[in-house]
């Protein structure tokens, strides 16, 4: 009997969120889960070659092996480079607000 893993894949945009429950074969990777979820097809803005993935909020490589009940998260790309935003604020003489 082949072992199976129950995992979830999560992705969120400002207008919609996905949480897809999957059953995958033992030894499946984070990338396997992302591909099997169907989210990449539903969200053309995601670049398969540059996916940023995580498991329970911690960065994970695409080839990271999954365990039972893991939640794979697909992260959106940053809209702005944090260093560049900080530099622009410094040039404008603005202080960053504490806490965000």
Curated annotation (Swiss-Prot):
Gene3D superfamilies on file: RnfH-like (3.10.20.280)
Superkingdom to which the source organism belongs: Bacteria
Pfam families named among the record's database cross-references: Ub-RnfH (PF03658)
Family annotation (InterPro entries): Mopterin_synth/thiamin_S_b, RnfH, RnfH_sf
Family: Belongs to the UPF0125 (RnfH) family.
PANTHER family, alphabetized: UPF0125 PROTEIN RATB (PTHR37483:SF1)
NCBIfam families given in the database record: PRK01777.1
The protein, known as: UPF0125 protein CV_3462
């Amino acid at each position: 009997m082949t072992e199976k893993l129950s995992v979830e894949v999560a992705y969120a945009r400002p207008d919609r969120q996905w949480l897809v429950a999957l059953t995958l074969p033992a030894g499946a990777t984070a990338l396997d889960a992302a591909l099997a979820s169907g989210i990449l097809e539903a969200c053309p803005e995601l670049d398969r070659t540059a996916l940023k993935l995580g498991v329970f909020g911690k960065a994970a490589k695409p080839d990271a092996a999954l365990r039972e009940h893991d939640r794979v998260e697909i992260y959106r790309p940053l809209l702005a480079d944090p260093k560049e935003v900080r530099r622009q604020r410094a040039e404008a003489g603005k202080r960053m607000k504490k806490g965000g």
